[in-house]
């Protein structure tokens, strides 16, 4: 059984026991979070596709940790002008483990 959920403006294909890195959620590690925006559910026999979401479906997950991804460095320069700028960015994430899919 798997489902497609939408969170943080992105879509993720998840199954029970999967660990997924999603955009940062304001929850503490160890808490449970419920994803109500389920776009698709497949139980092996049939597939339910939502319009836009599947009614009554939800995915329950446990928050494992909060963190930041590796640093992405951007370097801008203008040739012959002695002008350069270096930027760094670390995107925050939340790691969740899928506990159940209810359809």
Swiss-Prot record:
GO biological process, one term: translation
Domain of life: Bacteria
InterPro entries from the UniProt entry: bL21-like, bL21-like_sf, Ribosomal_bL21, Ribosomal_bL21_CS
GO cellular component terms given for this protein: cytoplasm; ribonucleoprotein complex; ribosome
UniProt KW keywords: Ribonucleoprotein, Ribosomal protein, RNA-binding, rRNA-binding
Gene Ontology MF term list: rRNA binding; structural constituent of ribosome
Signal peptide: none
Role noted for this protein: This protein binds to 23S rRNA in the presence of protein L20.
Subunit structure: Part of the 50S ribosomal subunit. Contacts protein L20.
Classification via NCBIfam families: L21
Family the entry assigns: Belongs to the bacterial ribosomal protein bL21 family.
The protein, known as: Large ribosomal subunit protein bL21
């Amino acid at each position: 059984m798997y489902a497609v959920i939408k969170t943080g403006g992105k879509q993720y294909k998840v199954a029970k026991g999967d660990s997924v890195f999603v955009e940062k959620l304001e929850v503490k590690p160890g808490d449970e979070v419920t994803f109500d925006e389920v776009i698709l559910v497949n139980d092996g026999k049939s597939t339910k596709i939502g319009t836009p979401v599947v009614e009554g479906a939800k995915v329950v997950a446990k928050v494992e940790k909060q963190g930041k991804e590796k640093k992405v460095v951007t370097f801008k320069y203008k040739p012959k002008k002695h002008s350069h700028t270096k930027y760094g960015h670390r995107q925050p994430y939340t790691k969740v483990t899928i506990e159940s899919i209810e359809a």
